[in-house]
């Protein structure tokens, strides 16, 4: 009997789609020209890079000249935050506002700036992981250079009130950046209508290859060059263009934003069924807001067990999942995201993240809700923490 395989970790990465792979292949063997070369092979490559730029721009409601290709979402975040910090420092503005539960690409960049003379204010989230725009308003100062708030959280899927936060920034005359790596393709985005000044995205979250990303920078914002060298990316990011990856990103984002409502209508009922069934397990809680969350995100904590053990057991049963973000899954520290919404360390350690797409069928859903309770029960039967809980003893 063939072993069942269910991939439920799309927030960590996604498979390259057949459509994207087919679009990329010619650029490895036949259309391999350097996009900076003036002969036809190079001109064709440059044309296709610009076509991909147009696709990314259209998907975001931006203009092509506002799109720059990068290697990943983390690079885009670094450029937006460090670039703005350098730009605004010349005007005496050395204060950044962000939240306590951003991706580490944002948090660690802010920590870097703190070590180099900048001040950072970390606004809180409520127990559902939502930011109050009024907290952002209170945090903004005369010397604030940038507000950077993620669009949707990578662990608990909470979707932030981006338009309201952007409106606060616009009112205060402060630039606003959002890490939308998890949001693109799952929610409708229009950077101009929403008042977003800068936005980061990553290809491998939307079925493009790893190692390609992009950043939207509103026209009129002139960030310092990210990489010095040749004139690629209008002189802002030197280095020979990764044409196959760029073309793939264009195809991927075009597909990702196609029929988002229809895709969500398929995924959300499956997500809700999993949540409803798993919450029947005693001493279990849903992390994040029930409604204001990404369509395929499920994050649940099971008291009395370790997330790592849960993942290993699920893997043996053919289910790929996560206990937090893949970037930190090797760490024994509890998720900073879960701690920020008020979970105790022991409860945060027992978290499970499932991130599903349309390819997780109704049959797969039934297997998931049949398997996980059995695994949780088995782990609890071996857990000294669970035993202490049942005796009413403190365990955290």
UniProtKB/Swiss-Prot annotation:
Quaternary data: Homodimer. Forms a heterotetramer with IscU, interacts with other sulfur acceptors.
Record-listed pyridoxal 5'-phosphate binding positions: 73-74, 154, 182, 202-204, 240
Modified positions (N6-(pyridoxal phosphate)lysine) in chain numbering: 205
Active site positions, chain numbering: 327
Pfam families with a match to the protein in the record: Aminotran_5
Protein name in UniProt: Cysteine desulfurase IscS
Entries under InterPro entries matching the protein: Aminotrans_V_dom, Aminotrans_V_PyrdxlP_BS, Cys_deSase_IscS, Cys_deSase_NifS_bac/arc, Cysteine_dSase, PyrdxlP-dep_Trfase, PyrdxlP-dep_Trfase_major, PyrdxlP-dep_Trfase_small
HAMAP family in UniProt: Cys_desulf_IscS (MF_00331)
Binding residue positions for [2Fe-2S] cluster: 327
Molecular function in Gene Ontology: 2 iron, 2 sulfur cluster binding; cysteine desulfurase activity; metal ion binding; pyridoxal phosphate binding
EC number(s) given by UniProt: 2.8.1.7
Compartment list: Cytoplasm
Keywords associated with the record: 2Fe-2S, Cytoplasm, Iron, Iron-sulfur, Metal-binding, Pyridoxal phosphate, Transferase
Temperature dependence: Optimum temperature is 37 degrees Celsius.
Functional summary from the UniProt entry: Functions as a sulfur delivery protein for Fe-S cluster synthesis onto IscU, an Fe-S scaffold assembly protein, as well as other S acceptor proteins. Catalyzes the removal of elemental sulfur atoms from cysteine to produce alanine.
Cofactors required: pyridoxal 5'-phosphate
Gene Ontology cellular component terms for the protein in this record: L-cysteine desulfurase complex
Reactions mediated catalytically: (sulfur carrier)-H + L-cysteine = (sulfur carrier)-SH + L-alanine
Family: Belongs to the class-V pyridoxal-phosphate-dependent aminotransferase family. NifS/IscS subfamily.
PANTHER family: CYSTEINE DESULFURASE, CYSTEINE DESULFURYLASE FAMILY MEMBER
Influence of pH: Optimum pH is 8.3-8.6.
Pathway membership, UniProt: Cofactor biosynthesis; iron-sulfur cluster biosynthesis
């Amino acid at each position: 009997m063939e072993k069942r395989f269910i991939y439920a970790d799309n927030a960590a990465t996604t498979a390259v789609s057949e459509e994207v792979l087919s679009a990329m292949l010619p650029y490895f063997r036949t259309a391999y020209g350097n996009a900076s070369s003036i002969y036809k092979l190079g001109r064709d490559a440059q044309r296709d890079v610009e076509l991909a730029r147009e696709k990314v721009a259209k998907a975001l409601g931006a203009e092509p000249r506002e799109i720059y290709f990068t290697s990943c979402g983390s690079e885009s975040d670094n450029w937006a935050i460090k670039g703005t910090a350098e730009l605004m420092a010349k005007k005496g503005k050395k204060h950044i506002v962000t939240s306590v539960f951003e991706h580490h690409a944002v948090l660690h960049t802010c920590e870097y700036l703190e070590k180099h003379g900048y001040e950072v204010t970390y606004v809180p989230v409520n127990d559902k992981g939502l930011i109050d725009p009024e907290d952002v308003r209170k945090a903004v100062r005369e010397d604030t250079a940038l507000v950077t708030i993620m669009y949707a959280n990578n662990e608990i899927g909470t979707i932030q009130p981006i338009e309201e936060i952007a409106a606060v920034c616009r009112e205060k005359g402060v630039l606003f950046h959002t890490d939308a790596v998890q949001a693109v393709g799952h929610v409708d985005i229009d950077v101009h209508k929403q008042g977003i000044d800068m936005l980061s995205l990553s290809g491998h979250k939307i079925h493009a290859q790893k190692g390609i990303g992009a950043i939207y920078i509103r026209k009129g914002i002139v960030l310092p060059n990210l990489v010095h060298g040749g004139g690629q990316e209008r002189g802002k990011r030197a280095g020979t263009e990764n044409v196959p990856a760029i073309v793939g990103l264009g195809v991927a984002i075009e597909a990702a934003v196609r029929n988002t409502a229809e895709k969500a209508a398929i995924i959300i009922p499956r997500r809700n069924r999993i949540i409803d069934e798993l919450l029947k397990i005693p001493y279990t809680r849903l992390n994040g807001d029930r409604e204001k969350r990404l369509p395929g995100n499920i994050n649940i904590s099971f008291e009395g067990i370790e997330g790592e053990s849960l993942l290993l057991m699920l893997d043996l049963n053919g289910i790929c999942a996560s206990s937090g973000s893949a970037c930190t899954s090797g760490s024994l520290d509890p998720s900073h995201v879960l701690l920020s919404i008020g979970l105790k360390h022991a409860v945060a350690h027992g978290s499970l993240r499932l991130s599903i797409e349309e390819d997780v069928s109704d049959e797969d859903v039934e297997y998931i809700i049949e398997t996980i309770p059995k695994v949780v029960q088995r782990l609890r039967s071996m857990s000294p923490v669970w035993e202490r809980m049942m005796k009413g003893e403190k365990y955290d």
